[in-house]
Amino acid sequence: MNSTILLAQDAVSEGVGNPILNISVFVVFIIVTMTVVLRVGKSTSESTDFYTGGASFSGTQNGLAIAGDYLSAASFLGIVGAISLNGYDGFLYSIGFFVAWLVALLLVAEPLRNVGRFTMADVLSFRLRQKPVRVAAACGTLAVTLFYLIAQMAGAGSLVSVLLDIHEFKWQAVVVGIVGIVMIAYVLLGGMKGTTYVQMIKAVLLVGGVAIMTVLTFVKVSGGLTTLLNDAVEKHAASDYAATKGYDPTQILEPGLQYGATLTTQLDFISLALALCLGTAGLPHVLMRFYTVPTAKEARKSVTWAIVLIGAFYLMTLVLGYGAAALVGPDRVIAAPGAANAAAPLLAFELGGSIFMALISAVAFATVLAVVAGLAITASAAVGHDIYNAVIRNGQSTEAEQVRVSRITVVVIGLISIVLGILAMTQNVAFLVALAFAVAASANLPTILYSLYWKKFNTTGAVAAIYTGLISALLLIFLSPAVSGNDSAMVPGADWAIFPLKNPGLVSIPLAFIAGWIGTLVGKPDNMDDLAAEMEVRSLTGVGVEKAVDH
Protein backbone atom coordinates (compact mmCIF):
# COMPACT_ATOMS: atom_id res chain seq x y z
CA MET A 1 0.00 0.00 0.00
CA ASN A 2 1.50 3.30 -1.04
CA SER A 3 2.52 6.13 1.24
CA THR A 4 -0.83 7.86 0.86
CA ILE A 5 -2.30 5.69 3.58
CA LEU A 6 0.68 5.36 5.86
CA LEU A 7 1.58 7.40 8.91
CA ALA A 8 3.31 10.64 7.98
CA GLN A 9 6.84 10.34 9.28
CA ASP A 10 6.98 13.96 10.45
CA ALA A 11 3.39 14.33 11.54
CA VAL A 12 2.09 17.72 12.52
CA SER A 13 -0.14 18.05 15.54
CA GLU A 14 -3.76 18.44 14.64
CA GLY A 15 -4.66 19.72 18.08
CA VAL A 16 -8.29 18.68 18.05
CA GLY A 17 -10.47 17.39 20.82
CA ASN A 18 -9.95 17.42 24.57
CA PRO A 19 -7.41 14.80 25.73
CA ILE A 20 -8.79 14.76 29.29
CA LEU A 21 -12.34 14.23 28.03
CA ASN A 22 -11.15 11.53 25.63
CA ILE A 23 -9.29 9.54 28.27
CA SER A 24 -12.22 9.90 30.70
CA VAL A 25 -14.63 8.35 28.19
CA PHE A 26 -12.13 5.53 27.59
CA VAL A 27 -11.82 4.78 31.29
CA VAL A 28 -15.61 4.75 31.77
CA PHE A 29 -16.03 2.33 28.87
CA ILE A 30 -13.33 -0.01 30.19
CA ILE A 31 -14.92 -0.01 33.67
CA VAL A 32 -18.41 -0.75 32.28
CA THR A 33 -17.28 -3.55 29.98
CA MET A 34 -15.01 -5.08 32.61
CA THR A 35 -17.99 -5.16 34.98
CA VAL A 36 -20.01 -7.01 32.31
CA VAL A 37 -17.15 -9.46 31.78
CA LEU A 38 -16.89 -10.19 35.50
CA ARG A 39 -20.65 -10.71 35.86
CA VAL A 40 -21.15 -13.07 32.91
CA GLY A 41 -17.79 -14.83 32.97
CA LYS A 42 -17.89 -16.40 36.44
CA SER A 43 -18.10 -19.97 35.14
CA THR A 44 -15.08 -20.49 32.87
CA SER A 45 -13.33 -23.39 34.57
CA GLU A 46 -14.51 -25.91 31.97
CA SER A 47 -13.25 -25.86 28.40
CA THR A 48 -16.79 -25.67 26.95
CA ASP A 49 -17.46 -22.48 28.91
CA PHE A 50 -14.06 -20.92 28.23
CA TYR A 51 -13.96 -21.63 24.47
CA THR A 52 -17.62 -21.37 23.38
CA GLY A 53 -19.57 -19.90 26.31
CA GLY A 54 -21.34 -23.25 26.65
CA ALA A 55 -22.86 -22.83 23.16
CA SER A 56 -25.64 -20.94 24.93
CA PHE A 57 -26.12 -17.89 22.69
CA SER A 58 -29.05 -17.32 20.35
CA GLY A 59 -28.57 -16.67 16.65
CA THR A 60 -29.39 -12.98 17.10
CA GLN A 61 -26.93 -12.59 19.97
CA ASN A 62 -24.24 -14.43 18.08
CA GLY A 63 -24.93 -12.40 14.94
CA LEU A 64 -24.28 -9.24 16.94
CA ALA A 65 -21.12 -10.79 18.36
CA ILE A 66 -19.91 -11.88 14.90
CA ALA A 67 -20.38 -8.32 13.66
CA GLY A 68 -18.52 -7.10 16.73
CA ASP A 69 -15.73 -9.58 16.10
CA TYR A 70 -15.46 -8.90 12.38
CA LEU A 71 -15.78 -5.11 12.24
CA SER A 72 -12.26 -4.34 13.36
CA ALA A 73 -10.11 -1.22 13.56
CA ALA A 74 -9.35 -1.83 9.89
CA SER A 75 -13.05 -1.58 9.04
CA PHE A 76 -13.59 1.72 10.81
CA LEU A 77 -10.28 3.59 10.97
CA GLY A 78 -8.44 2.06 8.02
CA ILE A 79 -11.21 2.06 5.40
CA VAL A 80 -12.51 5.55 6.18
CA GLY A 81 -8.94 6.81 5.92
CA ALA A 82 -8.26 4.89 2.71
CA ILE A 83 -11.41 6.30 1.04
CA SER A 84 -10.63 9.84 2.21
CA LEU A 85 -7.24 9.69 0.46
CA ASN A 86 -7.74 7.23 -2.41
CA GLY A 87 -11.47 7.49 -3.08
CA TYR A 88 -13.03 4.53 -4.86
CA ASP A 89 -9.92 2.36 -4.54
CA GLY A 90 -10.19 2.67 -0.75
CA PHE A 91 -13.81 1.49 -0.95
CA LEU A 92 -12.55 -1.76 -2.50
CA TYR A 93 -11.70 -2.88 1.04
CA SER A 94 -15.35 -2.50 2.06
CA ILE A 95 -16.50 -4.46 -0.98
CA GLY A 96 -14.01 -7.27 -0.38
CA PHE A 97 -14.70 -7.58 3.35
CA PHE A 98 -18.46 -7.78 2.71
CA VAL A 99 -18.44 -10.15 -0.29
CA ALA A 100 -16.28 -12.48 1.78
CA TRP A 101 -19.24 -13.17 4.04
CA LEU A 102 -21.20 -14.69 1.18
CA VAL A 103 -18.36 -17.18 0.65
CA ALA A 104 -18.37 -18.03 4.35
CA LEU A 105 -22.16 -18.47 4.43
CA LEU A 106 -22.41 -20.58 1.28
CA LEU A 107 -19.41 -22.86 1.79
CA VAL A 108 -18.38 -23.28 5.41
CA ALA A 109 -20.71 -21.85 8.09
CA GLU A 110 -23.20 -24.71 8.52
CA PRO A 111 -20.99 -27.77 7.86
CA LEU A 112 -18.25 -26.36 10.07
CA ARG A 113 -20.72 -25.87 12.92
CA ASN A 114 -22.09 -29.40 12.46
CA VAL A 115 -18.73 -31.19 12.43
CA GLY A 116 -16.56 -29.22 14.87
CA ARG A 117 -16.69 -28.55 18.58
CA PHE A 118 -14.22 -25.84 19.63
CA THR A 119 -11.72 -25.09 16.87
CA MET A 120 -11.09 -25.25 13.13
CA ALA A 121 -8.76 -28.22 13.73
CA ASP A 122 -11.71 -30.29 15.02
CA VAL A 123 -13.08 -30.26 11.47
CA LEU A 124 -9.76 -30.72 9.67
CA SER A 125 -8.74 -33.70 11.80
CA PHE A 126 -12.16 -35.39 12.00
CA ARG A 127 -11.36 -38.09 9.42
CA LEU A 128 -7.57 -37.59 9.21
CA ARG A 129 -4.66 -38.43 11.50
CA GLN A 130 -5.07 -36.22 14.55
CA LYS A 131 -1.56 -35.13 15.55
CA PRO A 132 0.00 -33.84 12.31
CA VAL A 133 -3.20 -32.13 11.20
CA ARG A 134 -3.86 -30.47 14.57
CA VAL A 135 -0.29 -29.17 14.82
CA ALA A 136 -0.46 -27.77 11.28
CA ALA A 137 -3.89 -26.22 11.88
CA ALA A 138 -2.71 -24.67 15.15
CA CYS A 139 0.29 -23.13 13.35
CA GLY A 140 -2.04 -21.63 10.74
CA THR A 141 -4.38 -20.33 13.43
CA LEU A 142 -1.58 -18.71 15.43
CA ALA A 143 -0.06 -17.06 12.33
CA VAL A 144 -3.38 -15.53 11.23
CA THR A 145 -4.21 -14.49 14.78
CA LEU A 146 -0.87 -12.74 15.24
CA PHE A 147 -1.20 -10.79 11.98
CA TYR A 148 -4.70 -9.70 12.96
CA LEU A 149 -3.60 -8.76 16.48
CA ILE A 150 -0.76 -6.66 15.09
CA ALA A 151 -3.26 -4.69 12.99
CA GLN A 152 -5.54 -4.01 15.96
CA MET A 153 -2.64 -2.94 18.18
CA ALA A 154 -1.37 -0.60 15.46
CA GLY A 155 -4.87 0.84 15.15
CA ALA A 156 -5.01 1.45 18.89
CA GLY A 157 -1.68 3.26 18.79
CA SER A 158 -2.79 5.52 15.93
CA LEU A 159 -6.19 6.24 17.49
CA VAL A 160 -4.98 7.20 20.94
CA SER A 161 -2.08 9.19 19.50
CA VAL A 162 -4.65 11.46 17.84
CA LEU A 163 -6.97 11.66 20.82
CA LEU A 164 -4.29 12.40 23.40
CA ASP A 165 -2.10 14.37 20.96
CA ILE A 166 0.81 11.99 21.55
CA HIS A 167 3.69 12.30 19.09
CA GLU A 168 6.54 10.59 20.90
CA PHE A 169 7.04 6.97 19.86
CA LYS A 170 7.70 5.76 23.40
CA TRP A 171 4.34 7.04 24.68
CA GLN A 172 2.52 5.58 21.69
CA ALA A 173 4.17 2.28 22.59
CA VAL A 174 2.88 2.62 26.16
CA VAL A 175 -0.66 3.04 24.78
CA VAL A 176 -0.35 -0.16 22.74
CA GLY A 177 0.90 -1.94 25.87
CA ILE A 178 -2.12 -0.79 27.88
CA VAL A 179 -4.52 -2.05 25.19
CA GLY A 180 -2.78 -5.43 25.28
CA ILE A 181 -3.01 -5.67 29.05
CA VAL A 182 -6.74 -4.82 29.08
CA MET A 183 -7.35 -7.43 26.36
CA ILE A 184 -5.52 -10.07 28.39
CA ALA A 185 -7.67 -9.21 31.41
CA TYR A 186 -10.92 -9.50 29.40
CA VAL A 187 -10.08 -13.01 28.23
CA LEU A 188 -8.60 -14.32 31.47
CA LEU A 189 -11.60 -13.15 33.49
CA GLY A 190 -14.46 -13.74 31.06
CA GLY A 191 -13.53 -16.44 28.56
CA MET A 192 -15.74 -16.67 25.47
CA LYS A 193 -18.91 -15.67 27.31
CA GLY A 194 -17.45 -12.43 28.64
CA THR A 195 -15.78 -11.69 25.31
CA THR A 196 -19.05 -12.30 23.44
CA TYR A 197 -20.96 -9.77 25.53
CA VAL A 198 -18.22 -7.19 24.97
CA GLN A 199 -18.47 -7.84 21.22
CA MET A 200 -22.27 -7.49 21.29
CA ILE A 201 -22.06 -4.15 23.11
CA LYS A 202 -19.37 -2.94 20.74
CA ALA A 203 -21.37 -3.95 17.62
CA VAL A 204 -24.39 -1.93 18.73
CA LEU A 205 -22.23 1.08 19.61
CA LEU A 206 -20.18 0.93 16.41
CA VAL A 207 -23.03 0.50 13.92
CA GLY A 208 -25.13 3.05 15.83
CA GLY A 209 -22.27 5.55 16.03
CA VAL A 210 -21.44 5.20 12.34
CA ALA A 211 -25.13 5.66 11.44
CA ILE A 212 -25.24 8.91 13.44
CA MET A 213 -22.04 10.10 11.74
CA THR A 214 -23.53 9.29 8.33
CA VAL A 215 -26.66 11.35 8.99
CA LEU A 216 -24.62 14.26 10.39
CA THR A 217 -22.32 14.16 7.36
CA PHE A 218 -25.25 14.68 4.97
CA VAL A 219 -26.59 17.45 7.23
CA LYS A 220 -23.18 19.15 7.29
CA VAL A 221 -22.75 19.19 3.50
CA SER A 222 -26.38 20.35 3.08
CA GLY A 223 -27.15 17.90 0.31
CA GLY A 224 -27.13 14.32 -0.88
CA LEU A 225 -24.42 11.99 -2.09
CA THR A 226 -23.75 14.02 -5.26
CA THR A 227 -23.04 17.15 -3.22
CA LEU A 228 -20.79 15.18 -0.91
CA LEU A 229 -18.76 13.73 -3.78
CA ASN A 230 -18.41 17.13 -5.47
CA ASP A 231 -17.22 18.69 -2.19
CA ALA A 232 -14.66 15.90 -1.80
CA VAL A 233 -13.30 16.53 -5.30
CA GLU A 234 -13.06 20.28 -4.61
CA LYS A 235 -11.21 19.66 -1.34
CA HIS A 236 -8.72 17.38 -3.09
CA ALA A 237 -8.30 19.92 -5.90
CA ALA A 238 -7.33 22.61 -3.39
CA SER A 239 -4.96 20.38 -1.41
CA ASP A 240 -1.17 20.28 -1.38
CA TYR A 241 -1.54 16.51 -1.12
CA ALA A 242 -3.03 16.19 -4.62
CA ALA A 243 -0.46 18.59 -6.03
CA THR A 244 2.39 16.59 -4.51
CA LYS A 245 1.01 13.25 -5.71
CA GLY A 246 0.19 14.66 -9.13
CA TYR A 247 -3.25 13.13 -9.72
CA ASP A 248 -6.46 14.57 -11.16
CA PRO A 249 -8.84 15.18 -8.18
CA THR A 250 -11.74 13.62 -10.10
CA GLN A 251 -9.85 10.29 -9.94
CA ILE A 252 -11.10 9.79 -6.38
CA LEU A 253 -14.52 9.03 -7.93
CA GLU A 254 -13.35 6.22 -10.20
CA PRO A 255 -11.23 3.05 -10.01
CA GLY A 256 -7.50 3.23 -10.60
CA LEU A 257 -6.06 6.01 -8.44
CA GLN A 258 -4.17 3.54 -6.26
CA TYR A 259 -4.32 0.26 -8.17
CA GLY A 260 -4.61 1.22 -11.85
CA ALA A 261 -1.35 2.93 -12.76
CA THR A 262 0.75 -0.09 -13.80
CA LEU A 263 0.42 -3.81 -14.44
CA THR A 264 2.01 -4.48 -11.04
CA THR A 265 -0.56 -2.38 -9.16
CA GLN A 266 -3.38 -4.01 -11.14
CA LEU A 267 -2.09 -7.47 -10.18
CA ASP A 268 -1.77 -6.21 -6.61
CA PHE A 269 -5.45 -5.30 -6.71
CA ILE A 270 -6.41 -8.78 -7.95
CA SER A 271 -4.25 -10.29 -5.21
CA LEU A 272 -5.88 -8.07 -2.58
CA ALA A 273 -9.38 -8.91 -3.86
CA LEU A 274 -8.65 -12.65 -3.72
CA ALA A 275 -7.34 -12.38 -0.18
CA LEU A 276 -10.29 -10.31 1.04
CA CYS A 277 -13.00 -12.41 -0.63
CA LEU A 278 -11.59 -15.80 0.39
CA GLY A 279 -9.98 -14.85 3.69
CA THR A 280 -13.06 -14.62 5.92
CA ALA A 281 -13.96 -18.29 5.38
CA GLY A 282 -10.51 -19.16 6.78
CA LEU A 283 -10.35 -16.74 9.73
CA PRO A 284 -10.14 -18.89 12.89
CA HIS A 285 -11.68 -16.30 15.23
CA VAL A 286 -14.71 -15.89 12.93
CA LEU A 287 -15.13 -19.65 12.41
CA MET A 288 -14.96 -20.21 16.17
CA ARG A 289 -18.04 -18.03 16.65
CA PHE A 290 -20.20 -20.66 14.89
CA TYR A 291 -19.59 -22.98 17.87
CA THR A 292 -21.19 -20.60 20.39
CA VAL A 293 -24.74 -21.42 19.22
CA PRO A 294 -26.58 -24.67 19.97
CA THR A 295 -27.78 -25.63 16.47
CA ALA A 296 -26.93 -25.25 12.79
CA LYS A 297 -30.18 -23.29 12.36
CA GLU A 298 -28.97 -20.73 14.89
CA ALA A 299 -25.59 -20.67 13.14
CA ARG A 300 -27.31 -19.72 9.87
CA LYS A 301 -29.38 -17.11 11.71
CA SER A 302 -26.16 -15.74 13.19
CA VAL A 303 -24.62 -15.24 9.77
CA THR A 304 -27.79 -13.63 8.42
CA TRP A 305 -27.83 -11.07 11.23
CA ALA A 306 -24.11 -10.50 10.83
CA ILE A 307 -24.46 -9.89 7.07
CA VAL A 308 -27.22 -7.30 7.60
CA LEU A 309 -25.17 -5.38 10.18
CA ILE A 310 -21.87 -5.72 8.33
CA GLY A 311 -23.42 -4.77 4.97
CA ALA A 312 -25.06 -1.65 6.42
CA PHE A 313 -21.80 -0.68 8.10
CA TYR A 314 -19.69 -0.98 4.95
CA LEU A 315 -22.18 1.07 2.91
CA MET A 316 -21.87 3.82 5.51
CA THR A 317 -18.06 3.77 5.35
CA LEU A 318 -18.40 5.10 1.79
CA VAL A 319 -20.20 8.18 3.12
CA LEU A 320 -17.76 8.65 5.99
CA GLY A 321 -14.71 8.25 3.76
CA TYR A 322 -15.84 10.87 1.27
CA GLY A 323 -17.15 12.91 4.21
CA ALA A 324 -13.65 12.99 5.67
CA ALA A 325 -12.30 14.01 2.25
CA ALA A 326 -14.86 16.83 1.94
CA LEU A 327 -15.00 18.15 5.50
CA VAL A 328 -11.50 17.41 6.82
CA GLY A 329 -9.44 17.25 3.65
CA PRO A 330 -6.44 15.11 2.70
CA ASP A 331 -3.88 17.63 4.00
CA ARG A 332 -5.22 17.56 7.56
CA VAL A 333 -5.69 13.78 7.48
CA ILE A 334 -2.13 13.04 6.38
CA ALA A 335 -0.68 15.58 8.86
CA ALA A 336 -2.40 14.13 11.93
CA PRO A 337 -0.67 11.62 14.24
CA GLY A 338 -1.93 8.44 12.64
CA ALA A 339 -2.45 9.85 9.13
CA ALA A 340 -5.17 7.85 7.32
CA ASN A 341 -6.08 6.03 10.53
CA ALA A 342 -7.01 9.43 12.03
CA ALA A 343 -9.60 10.37 9.37
CA ALA A 344 -12.64 8.99 11.24
CA PRO A 345 -11.90 10.72 14.59
CA LEU A 346 -11.14 13.99 12.76
CA LEU A 347 -14.46 13.73 10.89
CA ALA A 348 -16.26 13.15 14.20
CA PHE A 349 -14.66 16.35 15.54
CA GLU A 350 -15.89 18.30 12.49
CA LEU A 351 -19.41 16.92 12.92
CA GLY A 352 -19.91 17.26 16.67
CA GLY A 353 -16.93 18.82 18.39
CA SER A 354 -14.84 17.44 21.24
CA ILE A 355 -17.60 15.49 23.00
CA PHE A 356 -18.76 13.67 19.86
CA MET A 357 -15.15 12.95 18.90
CA ALA A 358 -14.54 11.46 22.35
CA LEU A 359 -17.62 9.23 22.09
CA ILE A 360 -16.84 7.99 18.56
CA SER A 361 -13.22 7.42 19.50
CA ALA A 362 -14.28 5.41 22.53
CA VAL A 363 -16.37 3.26 20.18
CA ALA A 364 -13.30 2.80 17.97
CA PHE A 365 -11.29 1.89 21.05
CA ALA A 366 -14.00 -0.60 21.99
CA THR A 367 -13.67 -2.02 18.49
CA VAL A 368 -10.00 -2.74 19.08
CA LEU A 369 -10.57 -4.29 22.52
CA ALA A 370 -13.44 -6.53 21.41
CA VAL A 371 -11.60 -7.86 18.37
CA VAL A 372 -8.30 -8.53 20.15
CA ALA A 373 -10.16 -10.36 22.91
CA GLY A 374 -11.80 -12.64 20.34
CA LEU A 375 -8.45 -13.26 18.67
CA ALA A 376 -6.83 -14.13 21.98
CA ILE A 377 -9.56 -16.70 22.72
CA THR A 378 -8.89 -18.31 19.34
CA ALA A 379 -5.15 -18.50 19.89
CA SER A 380 -5.64 -19.93 23.37
CA ALA A 381 -7.95 -22.65 22.01
CA ALA A 382 -5.42 -23.58 19.33
CA VAL A 383 -2.74 -24.18 21.95
CA GLY A 384 -4.84 -25.53 24.84
CA HIS A 385 -7.27 -27.71 22.89
CA ASP A 386 -5.38 -28.63 19.71
CA ILE A 387 -1.75 -28.87 20.78
CA TYR A 388 -1.74 -29.50 24.54
CA ASN A 389 -4.78 -31.76 24.86
CA ALA A 390 -4.85 -33.58 21.50
CA VAL A 391 -1.12 -33.81 20.73
CA ILE A 392 0.91 -33.56 23.94
CA ARG A 393 -1.56 -35.30 26.28
CA ASN A 394 -3.19 -37.57 23.65
CA GLY A 395 -6.64 -36.30 24.59
CA GLN A 396 -6.22 -37.28 28.24
CA SER A 397 -5.92 -33.85 29.88
CA THR A 398 -8.61 -32.56 32.21
CA GLU A 399 -10.73 -29.57 31.26
CA ALA A 400 -9.14 -27.53 34.05
CA GLU A 401 -5.68 -28.27 32.62
CA GLN A 402 -6.77 -27.18 29.14
CA VAL A 403 -8.15 -23.91 30.46
CA ARG A 404 -4.98 -23.27 32.48
CA VAL A 405 -2.77 -23.78 29.41
CA SER A 406 -5.11 -21.59 27.37
CA ARG A 407 -4.88 -18.78 29.91
CA ILE A 408 -1.09 -18.95 29.87
CA THR A 409 -1.27 -18.77 26.07
CA VAL A 410 -3.42 -15.63 26.28
CA VAL A 411 -0.72 -13.90 28.32
CA VAL A 412 2.10 -15.01 25.99
CA ILE A 413 0.26 -14.15 22.77
CA GLY A 414 -0.80 -10.83 24.26
CA LEU A 415 2.79 -9.86 25.08
CA ILE A 416 4.02 -10.90 21.62
CA SER A 417 1.27 -8.90 19.91
CA ILE A 418 2.12 -5.83 22.00
CA VAL A 419 5.74 -5.92 20.80
CA LEU A 420 4.84 -6.54 17.14
CA GLY A 421 2.02 -3.98 17.27
CA ILE A 422 4.48 -1.33 18.43
CA LEU A 423 6.75 -2.14 15.47
CA ALA A 424 3.82 -1.90 13.02
CA MET A 425 2.31 1.36 14.27
CA THR A 426 3.31 3.20 11.07
CA GLN A 427 1.18 0.92 8.85
CA ASN A 428 -2.42 1.42 7.72
CA VAL A 429 -4.52 -1.07 9.65
CA ALA A 430 -6.70 -2.05 6.68
CA PHE A 431 -3.55 -3.10 4.83
CA LEU A 432 -2.28 -5.13 7.80
CA VAL A 433 -5.61 -6.94 8.08
CA ALA A 434 -5.51 -7.67 4.35
CA LEU A 435 -2.24 -9.53 4.98
CA ALA A 436 -3.97 -11.57 7.72
CA PHE A 437 -6.75 -12.40 5.24
CA ALA A 438 -4.15 -13.54 2.70
CA VAL A 439 -2.54 -15.87 5.24
CA ALA A 440 -5.97 -17.24 6.26
CA ALA A 441 -7.05 -17.82 2.66
CA SER A 442 -3.73 -19.53 1.90
CA ALA A 443 -3.18 -21.66 5.00
CA ASN A 444 -6.71 -22.51 6.16
CA LEU A 445 -9.34 -22.24 3.42
CA PRO A 446 -7.99 -24.88 0.98
CA THR A 447 -7.79 -27.49 3.73
CA ILE A 448 -11.26 -26.63 5.06
CA LEU A 449 -12.87 -26.95 1.62
CA TYR A 450 -11.00 -30.15 0.76
CA SER A 451 -11.92 -31.70 4.14
CA LEU A 452 -15.60 -30.89 3.75
CA TYR A 453 -16.09 -31.64 0.07
CA TRP A 454 -13.42 -34.12 -1.18
CA LYS A 455 -13.79 -37.68 0.12
CA LYS A 456 -10.32 -38.78 -1.04
CA PHE A 457 -8.55 -35.94 0.79
CA ASN A 458 -5.95 -37.34 3.19
CA THR A 459 -3.54 -36.30 5.93
CA THR A 460 -0.63 -35.76 3.53
CA GLY A 461 -2.74 -33.39 1.46
CA ALA A 462 -3.94 -31.49 4.52
CA VAL A 463 -0.46 -30.97 5.95
CA ALA A 464 0.92 -30.04 2.52
CA ALA A 465 -1.84 -27.48 1.89
CA ILE A 466 -1.54 -25.82 5.29
CA TYR A 467 2.25 -25.55 5.39
CA THR A 468 2.58 -24.58 1.71
CA GLY A 469 -0.03 -21.85 2.05
CA LEU A 470 1.36 -20.61 5.36
CA ILE A 471 5.05 -20.61 4.43
CA SER A 472 4.53 -19.17 0.94
CA ALA A 473 2.30 -16.37 2.25
CA LEU A 474 4.70 -15.43 5.06
CA LEU A 475 7.76 -15.66 2.81
CA LEU A 476 6.21 -13.55 0.05
CA ILE A 477 5.09 -10.92 2.56
CA PHE A 478 8.64 -10.78 3.95
CA LEU A 479 10.06 -10.36 0.43
CA SER A 480 7.44 -7.81 -0.65
CA PRO A 481 7.54 -3.98 -0.85
CA ALA A 482 5.29 -3.93 2.21
CA VAL A 483 8.24 -4.89 4.43
CA SER A 484 11.25 -3.26 2.74
CA GLY A 485 12.44 -1.34 -0.29
CA ASN A 486 10.62 2.00 0.05
CA ASP A 487 10.02 4.82 2.51
CA SER A 488 6.55 3.56 3.46
CA ALA A 489 7.66 -0.02 4.24
CA MET A 490 7.74 -1.58 7.70
CA VAL A 491 11.58 -1.46 7.55
CA PRO A 492 12.14 1.70 5.47
CA GLY A 493 15.93 1.68 5.66
CA ALA A 494 16.39 -1.78 4.13
CA ASP A 495 15.74 -3.34 0.74
CA TRP A 496 15.32 -7.08 0.20
CA ALA A 497 12.03 -6.81 -1.73
CA ILE A 498 12.24 -9.21 -4.68
CA PHE A 499 8.49 -10.05 -4.86
CA PRO A 500 6.68 -7.17 -6.63
CA LEU A 501 3.21 -7.52 -5.04
CA LYS A 502 2.36 -6.16 -1.60
CA ASN A 503 -0.28 -8.85 -1.01
CA PRO A 504 0.73 -12.50 -1.63
CA GLY A 505 -2.77 -13.94 -2.20
CA LEU A 506 -2.54 -14.22 -5.98
CA VAL A 507 0.38 -16.65 -5.64
CA SER A 508 0.03 -18.28 -2.21
CA ILE A 509 -3.68 -19.23 -2.41
CA PRO A 510 -3.42 -21.26 -5.66
CA LEU A 511 -0.16 -22.80 -4.39
CA ALA A 512 -1.94 -24.12 -1.30
CA PHE A 513 -4.79 -25.64 -3.34
CA ILE A 514 -2.27 -27.29 -5.69
CA ALA A 515 -0.18 -28.59 -2.77
CA GLY A 516 -3.26 -30.13 -1.13
CA TRP A 517 -4.25 -31.83 -4.38
CA ILE A 518 -0.74 -33.19 -5.11
CA GLY A 519 -0.24 -34.26 -1.48
CA THR A 520 -3.47 -36.24 -1.58
CA LEU A 521 -2.51 -37.98 -4.83
CA VAL A 522 1.00 -39.00 -3.67
CA GLY A 523 0.19 -39.67 0.00
CA LYS A 524 -1.12 -42.88 1.49
CA PRO A 525 -4.89 -43.14 1.96
CA ASP A 526 -5.97 -42.82 5.59
CA ASN A 527 -8.43 -45.72 5.23
CA MET A 528 -11.02 -43.96 7.36
CA ASP A 529 -14.03 -44.42 5.11
CA ASP A 530 -16.39 -44.85 8.07
CA LEU A 531 -15.31 -41.52 9.56
CA ALA A 532 -15.55 -39.86 6.15
CA ALA A 533 -19.14 -41.09 5.81
CA GLU A 534 -19.95 -39.94 9.36
CA MET A 535 -18.44 -36.52 8.65
CA GLU A 536 -20.55 -36.16 5.52
CA VAL A 537 -23.75 -37.01 7.39
CA ARG A 538 -22.90 -34.70 10.29
CA SER A 539 -21.94 -31.81 8.02
CA LEU A 540 -25.30 -32.03 6.24
CA THR A 541 -27.61 -32.86 9.15
CA GLY A 542 -25.92 -31.84 12.40
CA VAL A 543 -26.55 -35.27 13.94
CA GLY A 544 -24.22 -35.86 16.87
CA VAL A 545 -23.41 -32.21 17.50
CA GLU A 546 -23.00 -31.33 21.16
CA LYS A 547 -26.11 -29.68 22.59
CA ALA A 548 -25.95 -26.39 24.42
CA VAL A 549 -25.37 -26.78 28.12
CA ASP A 550 -27.86 -25.40 30.60
CA HIS A 551 -26.71 -22.26 32.36
Curated annotation (Swiss-Prot):
Gene Ontology biological process terms from the UniProt entry: plasma membrane acetate transport
InterPro entries in the record: Na/Glc_symporter_sf, Na/solute_symporter, Sodium:Solute_Symporter
Molecular function via GO: acetate transmembrane transporter activity; symporter activity
Keywords noted in UniProt: Cell membrane, Membrane, Symport, Transmembrane, Transmembrane helix, Transport
Organism: Corynebacterium glutamicum (strain ATCC 13032 / DSM 20300 / JCM 1318 / BCRC 11384 / CCUG 27702 / LMG 3730 / NBRC 12168 / NCIMB 10025 / NRRL B-2784 / 534)
Tagged with keyword Transmembrane helix: yes
Function: Acts as a secondary carrier for acetate, propionate and pyruvate. Has high affinity for acetate and propionate and lower affinity for pyruvate. Driven by the electrochemical proton potential.
Keyword Lipoprotein assigned: no
Subcellular location: Cell membrane
Protein name as catalogued: Monocarboxylic acid transporter
GO cellular component: plasma membrane
Induction comment: Transcriptionally regulated by RamA and RamB.
Family annotation (Pfam families): SSF
Name of the encoding gene: mctC
Family statement: Belongs to the sodium:solute symporter (SSF) (TC 2.A.21) family.
UniProt topology in membrane: Multi-pass membrane protein
CDD domains xref list: SLC5sbd_u4 (cd11480)
Transmembrane feature ranges: 18-38, 63-83, 90-110, 144-164, 171-191, 203-223, 267-287, 307-327, 355-375, 411-431, 432-452, 463-483, 503-523
PANTHER family with a match to the protein in the record: CATION_ACETATE SYMPORTER ACTP (PTHR48086:SF6), SODIUM/PROLINE SYMPORTER-RELATED (PTHR48086)
